[in-house]
A protein has these predicted regions:
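Sequence-structural signature of mature extracellular/luminal beta-sheet repeat domains
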Residues: 37-346
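Bacterial Sec-dependent signal peptides at the C-terminal "C-region" and cleavage site
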Residues: 29-39
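N-terminal secretory signal peptides that target proteins for export/translocation
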Residues: 1-15
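Detector for intrinsically disordered, low-structure N-terminal pre-sequences
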Residues: 8, 24, 34-35, 76
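Residue-level detector of intrinsically disordered/flexible regions characterized by low predicted structural confidence
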Residues: 5, 17-18, 248, 287
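Bacterial N-terminal signal peptides
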Residues: 17-31
């Protein structure tokens, strides 16, 4: 369920750079799983470090608040069939849908944990992705697997097909985020954030927090095994480079060459920063959610151009609409900003 207004006000009052009308959004009545519509407020600011950012983000660009009142949002994905964006609310084990002009509405629950035994922690879906057939793939924390939704878009039910749930006979920790390449191979990260007791959880089976490749024919390979907390993952426009954010120590955004066979080589530090979810535009700029309460924008050469300062913890971002809109999951909110460059895949 969504937080009550009384529980939100103290947190909102501590947030700087938030337009006053956001209090209206936070106090919206919750009826039938819908967040009542309100005039869109704005939040945060744009920090410009390099003049090249002006070609990406216009001087009058603003981050709009599309939805509020969630527990912790993650995994935005644009779905053409719905003409909207889906995103996870992990602690509430739910996926929400936002479409232009309407309120955000509960779209699927449960989304990441389908067990009968009640559990706490981050049990829901995290990263969401469309495969090449247009199906919805989910990194499910609670069920500890990568799954495909086996349901219609217009009347979704919590029916899932398991794509993979273990490596060499041992259950995954809690798959977090995922990316797919042109031939349909799926790459995903597996940190322990979805385990109720983290690395000390007695149900933990794998010693490694790995990155994996699931090929279109169903074979599974561990392609990275030396990152403490692999998190966000995304391909460069030519798919010759795979970026992976490490949210453990030392915090770093890694880059890997992708061989013709799909293996990884030449792992190197791309940018020294903590990071969560990643997105890439068609010019190869890398958008890193998480550090310093916002989204860093980094050139293909690893130079910081600026940031989208949301003023709060930020988990992920993804391009949508016509490709020029960046959707951002930030704490209890879903945000968007219009850019001058398109995201990869548009």
């Amino acid at each position: 369920m969504l937080k009550t207004f009384a529980s939100l006000v103290p947190r909102l009052c501590r947030i700087n750079g938030l337009s006053a009308t956001l209090l209206t959004v936070a106090s919206m009545m919750i009826c039938g799983g819908d967040i009542a519509e309100a005039q869109l407020p704005t939040i945060g600011s744009i920090e410009r470090i390099d003049s090249r950012l002006d070609l990406i983000v216009s001087s009058d660009a603003e981050m709009e608040v599309l939805a509020a009142g969630h527990e912790w949002t993650e995994g935005p994905v644009w779905v053409p069939a719905l003409e909207g964006v889906l995103y996870s609310d992990i602690p509430n084990n739910a996926i929400y849908l936002w479409r232009e002009g309407g309120p955000a509405s509960l779209w699927l629950q449960p989304s990441g944990y389908t067990g009968e035994t009640p559990r706490g922690g981050e049990s829901g879906s995290n990263g969401l992705l469309l495969d090449h057939e247009g199906g919805l793939l989910l990194a499910q924390h609670g069920d500890r697997r990568i799954a495909r939704l086996d349901s219609s878009w217009d009347a979704p039910v919590a029916s899932f097909e398991t794509l993979v749930r273990e490596f060499e006979g041992k259950r995954f920790n809690s798959p977090n985020d995922l990316a797919v390449n042109a031939n349909g191979d799926l790459y995903f990260t597996d940190p322990p954030y979805g385990l109720e007791q983290g690395i000390e959880d007695p149900v933990k089976e794998l010693d490694v927090h790995g990155v994996y490749r699931l090929t279109a024919d169903g074979s599974l390979t561990q392609v990275i095994s030396d990152l403490p907390r692999p998190n966000g993952i995304a391909f460069s426009p030519d798919q010759g480079t795979l970026y992976v954010s490490n949210s453990g120590l030392p915090p770093v955004i890694m880059a890997y060459d992708v061989t013709s066979s799909g293996d990884l080589s030449n792992g190197r530090a791309f940018y020294q920063s903590w990071g969560d979810g990643l997105a890439i535009d068609q010019q190869g700029n890398v958008y890193v959610a998480g550090p310093d309460n916002g989204v860093l924008i980094i050139s293909p050469a690893g130079e910081l151009l600026g940031s989208l300062n949301t003023t709060q913890r930020t988990s992920n971002c993804a391009f949508g609409d016509d490709g020029y809109t960046l959707y951002i999951t930030s704490d209890m909110h879903l945000l968007r900003i219009r850019l001058n460059v398109k995201g990869v895949g548009f």
